[in-house]
């Protein structure tokens, strides 16, 4: 054996010996043996990622691996951090090929982001369970964060936020993170559900529905109709993440049905007509009172799958269907009276109930002194003074601006007109999710220049539009069976279980 060969063999043996003694400290603190094969594999993968073929770069790759190995083994310390190894690899790759070096660096940063998100997720969930994550626990006043049922929903929400960040394009998330836009409800983004809606209660009550695989037929009294309405509301709330609205107009026919039922009851008694009419009116008023009370208690005591009461609004629009204006007025009066009276809390003190929100429409027959239903508006104003409810909506202004008067979905989201056979349709519709542009942020970024302001605004509006398109695309292929109460049993539509909901959305 020649002298040079002996020397090379000795050097290789020394290198192998040093390599076998070298230890790597991983990110979680665990210590494992140094393995050059892992580095070799990572570099090969980086070249394949960029050039789709590493064969022509084998010599370069070999040089990089040799130099990386040399630098690591020259370290006097027995232990070396994984981050330091990655720094060395990126430096050596960059010396040979900056494109691959950038790809390697980008991959490393992406892996770091994933690791950080996992660590953050664990920390957020742990904080929900031990009560230290006050941001998550107190984010929604309608959710009692200390309850186990609510905590399950909050934990799922934290996972959804992490997953959403991996699904939503980087530029959109960056705009959200810096406050230029707000992507609402990231804690529900991964689920195949939508935001808020106007429930088609008329269809569900008149034609029947299904709740928990049980057939619910058309009610035969107001009391039953009001109870079914609250059950529908709870089911809908468990199938979406936003608010919902029903209208008293859809319940008004059952006031008439109850009256007719009471009239039949008294018809068999030989009583003076005036006395009989008084008895009928009194019994009907009692049923309305009991029905509204049941409705209020049901809405405020039911708990949905996400650990909260249904975010429900009730539309009070006297002229929505002129045939039932009188019946809507009777229901509205009782809703206002009971809201004024308050609901006892756990201490037995009458307080303002949370739900439903009341949406009271001002029109020609209830706005002016002397108008037929002005007494209702005076009652509503008393209610507002004490209970900060109802919200007021102007029929005149809505018709001037939009052309039609209709309620908001839940609290504030409002639909644009949509026509079927030339007629506007609002009930049985909803929205897919919400994005908000931060106008003060836009103004600051544009440095108070009007031209720049609109350019910046267009940029962020475009991101919001893309986010809306993502929500739409995400629902493609989703079947009606994902939320039967919405898509199969009338709240939104009457599809078959295997029908695509996107066809209805289109």
Language model feature labels by segment:
Residues 2-131:
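Charged, amphipathic alpha-helical regulatory modules used
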